Amino acid sequence: MRSPASSRRASALHRLCDSCRACGLSKVRCSKEKPTCSRCRRRGTVCEYVVTKRPGRKPDSRSEVEPEPGHLSHPLPSPESSTAISQGNLPDPDAFDPLFALPEPFDSTPELHSGPLSTVDSSLSSALTTWCPDFDDFFSFPVSTEDTLSGDRGAVYDGTIKHPPNLRRHSESPPAVPDDTIYLFGKPVDPAPPDQSLPATTTIGRRASPPSGRESEAGSRRLSCRCLIRALDLLKHFEVIRREAEIESSLPSIDAVVEVNKQTTEAITGMLQCPCSQKDGYLLVLLALIVCKILDRYAAAAIPGTEQGHDPTRRLDEGPMAGQRVLGELHCIQRVMNQLGPRLRMHGAQGASPGQAFHGTPAPLSVGLGDQLEPELHQRLSRLSSEIIRLLREAQ
């Protein structure tokens, strides 16, 4: 036998609606007369009062077994799994908890999920179910409390870092954690001092534009062309040799003289191949002086008594052999003079043009100086060869 409380609960659960079904569908006010309202009586329709559907638990639902709280909590990923995900070792998508998966389309309305869009929906659903952000790795990233704008405000972000290193899922190695947040404003500046020969950048993080062909060629010539310094070194070397000979009170051997003069002649030939020898008049004057030094050394080695302050009898190499050796080397000097002479005349003509002497011309040759240097070199060479030939004839 049922108790009064259970009967009242049952009657409350099965309460009828205030409006009949016909008035409810027509959305008009019902007279609430039972068993037939006045509107249904007037229309001649069936008046039916349905049972109300109250929200809430179903009766006797507490008797069912409630799920344990442990099944509803999702375990947090361990640090090992976070490291594996950050290094590119993604877990199997099928191994994810179904709580994070999107619900499948409703089966009650198949017409809404059929057609060409069903494939796109299914692919999007599968892509979203396999995505799992690594939040543990993200929150473990240290954040500096310093002001990020207190650094170099002139830095320009060059766009090479598209996302923070901790969100890279497919990197080869775990990202290096910087000490501060200055990496957000561009690449760090190299503490090493820059090369003075390279163009300096005016903005940190901005790469200098590559030089053009003409600029690079001019820069290479500026760095590699040291002809004027080499010419001065050759003159200094001749002075050192002269002072050493004075200290030793003896003349060098013919082999040493020929070897030094041959190396000097090759150096002059290399300088004449440089483009600066066609523009720099100072270099041409120095080369002419070096040629005079070479001829003087050949004369001192081949002709007895030419070198002042030394006894001709103390020469190591005497006789016609030294003259023949020097005479065989004069053709190299002749080739150098054939290249040097026209350039001396050209710069002498430029110095003779009006106004060149007062506008910073690179040619130090005054009017007629180039025309005087070239004949002087040829006269020295001609006198030396004539004297050597005379001595060789007398020795016979």
Curated annotation (Swiss-Prot):
Segments of skewed composition (Basic and acidic residues): 57-71
Q: Which InterPro entries match?
A: AflR, OAF3, Zn2-C6_fun-type_DNA-bd_sf, Zn2Cys6_DnaBD
Q: In which tissues is it expressed?
A: Specifically expressed in conidia.
The conditions that induce or repress this protein are given as: Expression is positively regulated by the transcription factors brlA and laeA.
Q: Does the keyword Transcription regulation apply?
A: yes
Highest taxon of the lineage: Eukaryota
GO cellular component terms, semicolon-separated: nucleus
Q: What happens when the gene is disrupted?
A: Resulted in loss of trypacidin and questin production.
Q: Does the keyword Metal-binding apply?
A: yes
Any one GO MF term held by the record is: DNA-binding transcription factor activity, RNA polymerase II-specific
| A single GO BP | aflatoxin biosynthetic process
Under the heading PANTHER family, the entry gives:
MONODICTYPHENONE CLUSTER TRANSCRIPTION FACTOR-RELATED (PTHR31069:SF31), OLEATE-ACTIVATED TRANSCRIPTION FACTOR 1-RELATED (PTHR31069)
Protein name from the UniProt record: Trypacidin cluster transcription factor
Species this chain originates from: Aspergillus fumigatus (strain ATCC MYA-4609 / CBS 101355 / FGSC A1100 / Af293) (Neosartorya fumigata)
